[in-house]
């Protein structure tokens, strides 16, 4: 079966084949076991509502469930059979709290810790003297991406269009250099973000490279690149025309939600105005979350550039978000060089040498970041008051 009992708390698992993600996150291996004797008689369709899943739970974890009020609260008690020993805290209560009231609850000391509290509330509680605020970098990055092609559903692959509006490399690089991300972070995020340079946060020390600078703010370089690419202001109105001297504008797609969504996109528009590029909102407004991704994935012709974010998994295989055949390669970029560099990241050599994948990943990032297709903007910190 591939399973071997070593002792009462240890099982050895043998595999006939392993993937390249084994060194970073287990390659999707299940990290917990389910008790067959406890669940085998429950039909799959009834599992979610079963009390053996919702309240009378057998678990390997430090706590067991006492009661569960769906969408409201969870009562926990220490598990005396936990493999590290019974926890010293006997019980815990987890409550779902409206973001409008969580800060006032923190002020009164009602809760010992708040998890997943919106970062835009940070300013309202950061100076409270009854809190100690901890934080860590999330496995996340926000980015700006340019549409350079379409996804061919028949062929099942991304087709890059050399005549797409955003196909010019120097144009994309100029727009990347034209955004002052450092200023944006200070103005909108209270220090809870920092400028990103790669599609992997520094938390992955082995894969992150300080030698890849990304696109630090450089408006003069941006203007130079636009001049070289043939985008020049021919009528003196402050905005550059395209290579043929015709009016040129970049259509932005950005998501609605939160107090800073609108000011943030206006910041982008103003920044690009300063290098002579006219930018407007696609659809004339911010786009609701689900509609936004529907439009992006459908390659809506009204979108030239969009602002979004990725959660970063531990597998660190970029083929899902940047591969030739991936529907989630939203810029729709494909090239032989990209294929070659990505293939090395999942090469069998990664299993022979734990360092091989990290070096292959950095080589791919050097190439891909320079293409300015999906430009990393910020890394984010999650906080625990």
Protein language model regions, located:
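Bilobed periplasmic-binding protein-like "clamshell/Venus-flytrap" ligand-binding domains
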Residues: 20-26, 186, 229-255, 303, ...
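Surface-exposed binding/hinge segments that line
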Residues: 1-42
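Append "and occasionally in soluble cytosolic enzymes with long acidic Gly/Pro-rich linkers
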Residues: 77-80, 165-270, 274, 337, ...
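A bilobed periplasmic-binding-protein/Venus flytrap-type ligand-binding module shared by bacterial periplasmic
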Residues: 77-80, 141-170, 187, 212, ...
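Gly/Pro-rich hinge or "lid" segments in bacterial periplasmic/extracellular proteins
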Residues: 28-87, 91, 101, 219-224
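Acidic-aromatic pocket-rim loops
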Residues: 136-156, 290-349
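Extracytoplasmic/peripheral linker and loop segments enriched in polar/acidic and small residues
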Residues: 2-4, 8, 164, 169-173, ...
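Ligand-site clamp/hinge motif
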Residues: 51, 79-124, 278-280, 285-287
